[in-house]
């Protein structure tokens, strides 16, 4: 029989994060050991169908009208969302996670995956108008905003010292599993 105190205790459990950002410590078979940015040791089971994508730096000028992008934004001082990072999806990933939702990178941040409808170049960067199925957003991208794109990757990229973001879920036995990992190339720390 489940008691009210048991239900209360379960309700108080912190939610399992859906992603971990950090540095690969080791790979042992199907286990990926990661030191999270917050210093926690995290062990992830790598699913058999796991996808590994590389991330590489590109320039702000590589963001074109028609590009499908993801951007983490925070509220700007003038009310216009300011990009913390921008990732340009390759054409075969168009539509991935389309929309805008809260995100856990920074306080009050959101993630928006959308198509660039307009880009205006100014003295302090670009102002992007992005559109997604349920809306649109204006985003300020400064010259110092990290801009990256995805490139093919594989499990061999997951070696000690690599900087990653892994998307994970909690399994019924309490362990964590990942089926998607993005790994920075050439020393890049995934900015998202």
Predicted regions and their residues:
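Sec-dependent N-terminal signal peptides
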Residues: 1-5
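Short, flexible, surface-exposed loop segments at domain boundaries
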Residues: 6-192
């Amino acid at each position: 029989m489940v008691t009210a105190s048991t239900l209360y205790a379960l309700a108080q459990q912190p939610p399992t994060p859906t992603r971990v950002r950090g540095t690969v410590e080791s790979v042992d078979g199907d286990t990926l050991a990661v030191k999270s940015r917050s210093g926690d040791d995290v062990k992830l089971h790598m699913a058999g169908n796991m996808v590994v994508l590389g991330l590489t730096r590109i320039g702000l000028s590589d963001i074109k009208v028609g590009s499908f992008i993801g951007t983490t934004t925070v509220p700007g001082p003038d009310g216009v969302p300011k990009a913390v990072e921008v990732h340009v999806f390759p054409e075969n990933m168009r539509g991935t996670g389309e929309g805008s939702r809260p995100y856990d990178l920074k306080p009050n941040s959101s993630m928006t995956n959308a198509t660039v409808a307009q880009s205006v170049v100014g003295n302090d960067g670009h102002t992007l108008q992005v559109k997604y199925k349920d809306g649109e957003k204006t985003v300020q991208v400064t010259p110092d905003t990290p801009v990256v794109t995805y490139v093919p990757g594989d499990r061999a990229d997951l070696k000690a010292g690599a900087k990653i973001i892994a998307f994970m879920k909690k399994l019924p036995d309490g362990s964590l599993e990942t089926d998607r990992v993005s790994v920075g190339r050439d020393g890049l720390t995934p900015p998202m």
